[in-house]
């Protein structure tokens, strides 16, 4: 961890830089795999699985028998926890349902919106160092609430061709339609273009490593929508002298254990807290099973001391963190001044872990500063809003002349004529 005290504004850009991974040949590699899958379908997907996941597969689909067997392997206490998380996620996302109302913009001119679910969506759930069954809930539950007809899930198998039981349990519970043993770039390509087994979808959701992220970016240029640009996960803790250093250190470490490219930041007005957090991080680090990962991640982490809360807020909004934890005595007032963040956790007893799993909010969030322009996944991510307008003769009489003038001044004669012929009919 790097301790920074009272940085000058000229240093902010350097201080707030995210970890950068080497990507010199990445896009060429990813593009090649995408093109191969697009041309060769299931055969190429299985070849990729053998190379990248060391799994020799004869079929890609997860069977009902496999799901039923997996459910038996999930411990009762984990099932209970998943049920609780599901209930809270459903409650929060159900409250986001759109209720469009008709608006009369003028007499005889009525406009409205209708929310329609995206019919086919694809969910990518990484394998890697941890089974992210929580991400299954975060993506499949709002998709189901939205009314998506087909929810396709791809996740990499282990070398024995098995998918983690908790992922399968969560997928069935959340209403996933089809599950496939496919990971990496090949999974994104398969969902973007379709194979003999895997349906083509209209929008792809889910996190992944730099290869998966690059694949999502490439297929989104023309062929399929994606949830958002994504990068390594990150957290900022914004704290004053009232914060508990044990809690702050725990929050920083909970982010650091995600991956070696994760970033954990503390921005504080208290030099005493900055010092105490360094001690607490070292103490708690010794208890972690993923200590090696956390230690490497902490190399990207910074503990920044600033002169006052005004500067802390300015620095925070410039950073635009994926996760922001506010541990100050007046956290509601401070929160009111946050304009750039993915998800905000207020007060000493609101750790990021709550949002990651079970509070009900979504943990699929914009990273890498994209919180300045993007929202996290919500019910809206799975729907489209179609606009409608009904114009009666009285409405056309009211707005028609203005349309004619505007079209004429844009030199679009056919646009003008489409109104003129109607006005002439009305005047008969």
Curated annotation (Swiss-Prot):
GO terms for cellular component: cytosol. This is Histidinol dehydrogenase. Pfam families: Histidinol_dh (PF00815). The keyword GTP-binding does not apply. Substrate binds at residues 233, 255, 258, 323, 356, 410, 415. Binds 1 zinc ion per subunit. InterPro entries: Ald_DH/histidinol_DH, Histidinol_DH_CS, Histidinol_DH_monofunct, Hstdl_DH. Its EC number is 1.1.1.23. GO terms for biological process: L-histidine biosynthetic process. The active site is at residues 322-323. Catalyzes the sequential NAD-dependent oxidations of L-histidinol to L-histidinaldehyde and then to L-histidine. NAD(+) binds at residues 124, 186, 209. Pathway: Amino-acid biosynthesis; L-histidine biosynthesis; L-histidine from 5-phospho-alpha-D-ribose 1-diphosphate: step 9/9. Keywords: Amino-acid biosynthesis, Histidine biosynthesis, Metal-binding, NAD, Oxidoreductase, Zinc. Belongs to the histidinol dehydrogenase family. Its cofactor is Zn(2+). SUPFAM superfamilies: ALDH-like. It comes from the Bacteria. GO terms for molecular function: histidinol dehydrogenase activity; NAD binding; zinc ion binding. It catalyses: L-histidinol + 2 NAD(+) + H2O = L-histidine + 2 NADH + 3 H(+). Zn(2+) binds at residues 255, 258, 356, 415. The keyword Transcription regulation does not apply. CDD domains: Histidinol_dh.
């Amino acid at each position: 961890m790097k301790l920074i005290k009272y940085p000058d504004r000229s240093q902010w850009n350097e201080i707030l830089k995210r970890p950068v991974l080497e990507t010199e040949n990445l896009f060429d590699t990813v593009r090649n795999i995408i093109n191969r899958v697009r041309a060769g379908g299931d055969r190429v997907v299985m070849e990729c699985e053998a190379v990248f996941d060391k799994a020799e597969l004869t079929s890609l689909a997860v069977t009902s028998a496999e799901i039923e067997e997996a459910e038996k392997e999930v411990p009762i206490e984990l099932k209970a926890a998943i049920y609780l998380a599901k209930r809270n996620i459903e409650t929060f996302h159900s409250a986001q349902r759109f209720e469009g109302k008709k608006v009369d913009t003028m007499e005889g001119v009525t406009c409205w919106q209708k929310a329609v679910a995206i019919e086919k969506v694809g969910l990518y759930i990484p394998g890697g160092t941890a089974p992210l069954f929580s991400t299954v809930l975060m993506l499949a539950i709002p998709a189901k609430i939205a009314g998506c007809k087909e929810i396709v899930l791809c996740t990499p198998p282990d070398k024995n061709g098995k998918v983690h039981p908790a992922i399968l349990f969560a997928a069935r519970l959340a209403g996933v339609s089809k599950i496939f043993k496919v990971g990496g770039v090949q999974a994104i390509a398969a969902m973007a273009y379709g194979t003999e087994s895997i349906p083509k979808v209209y929008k792809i959701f889910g996190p992944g490593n730099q290869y998966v992220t690059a694949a999502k970016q490439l297929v989104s240029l023309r062929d399929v929508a994606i949830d958002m640009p994504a990068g390594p996960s990150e957290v900022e803790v914004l704290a004053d002298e009232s914060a508990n250093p044990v809690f702050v250190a725990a929050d920083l470490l909970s982010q650091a254990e995600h991956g070696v490219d994760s970033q954990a930041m503390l921005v504080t007005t208290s030099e005493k807290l900055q010092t105490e957090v360094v001690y607490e991080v070292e103490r708690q680090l010794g208890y972690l099973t993923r200590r090696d990962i956390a230690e490497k991640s902490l190399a990207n982490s910074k503990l920044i001391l600033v002169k006052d809360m005004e500067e802390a807020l300015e620095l925070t909004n410039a950073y635009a963190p994926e996760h922001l934890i506010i541990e100050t005595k007046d956290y509601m007032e401070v929160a009111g001044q946050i304009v750039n963040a993915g998800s905000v956790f207020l007060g000493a007893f609101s750790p990021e872990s709550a949002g990651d799993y079970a509070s009900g909010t979504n943990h699929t969030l914009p990273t890498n500063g994209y919180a300045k322009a993007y929202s996290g996944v919500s019910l809206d991510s799975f729907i489209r809003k179609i606009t409608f307008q009904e114009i009666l003769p009285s409405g056309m009489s009211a707005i028609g002349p203005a349309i004619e003038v505007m079209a004429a001044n844009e030199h679009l004669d056919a646009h003008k004529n489409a109104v003129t012929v109607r006005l002439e009919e009305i005047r008969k």
